[in-house]
């Protein structure tokens, strides 16, 4: 699924214990959806902050989205996060409701290079217009990475 062990994954405790036991820890990876999404987003490639999964509760999720947007305004960092595939549509809806119209938002789905791969970066107001025209993506049950950056 283009994920990496430990990044938004429960493996960190196991890796830390291996270090404590003095065992050799050898990272092996394939393609990373986070890095591929960041590369394809067109957003700041020098600085990023990864937030893992956002809160499930809508009010908490909106608060964190606004905090990430404010952080991006201050630091010019690209803000990156993921979501459980069955909550993607709700997350996108929250983002479009609470983020500033000029904020850049990238949605990168099924980043494997296959026929279902879909990556798009637009300003929030352009996302809203596309959704109103029925041109928005269906993200339900699709693995996605989300990125934002303030201009």
Show where each model-derived region lies.
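Conserved Motif II region of HX4D acyltransferases
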Residues: 1-10
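Thr-Gly-centered strand-to-loop micro-motif
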Residues: 1, 51-52, 82-83
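Class I SAM-dependent methyltransferase SAM-binding "motif I" and its flanking Rossmann-like core
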Residues: 9-71
């Amino acid at each position: 699924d283009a994920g990496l062990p430990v990044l938004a994954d429960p493996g960190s405790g196991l890796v830390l214990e291996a270090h404590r036991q003095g065992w050799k820890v050898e990272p092996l990876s394939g393609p990373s959806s986070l890095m591929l999404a960041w590369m394809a987003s067109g957003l700041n490639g020098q600085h990023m902050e990864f937030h893992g999964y956002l809160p499930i509760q809508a009010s908490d999720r909106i608060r964190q989205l606004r905090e990430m947007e404010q952080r991006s305004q201050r630091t010019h960092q690209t803000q990156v996060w993921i979501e459980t595939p069955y909550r993607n549509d709700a997350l996108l809806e929250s983002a479009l409701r609470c983020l500033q119209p000029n904020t850049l938002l990238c949605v990168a789905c099924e980043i494997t290079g296959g026929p279902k791969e879909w990556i798009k970066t637009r300003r929030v107001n352009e996302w809203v217009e596309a959704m109103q025209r029925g041109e928005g993506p269906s993200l339900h049950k699709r693995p996605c990475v989300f990125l934002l950056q303030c201009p």
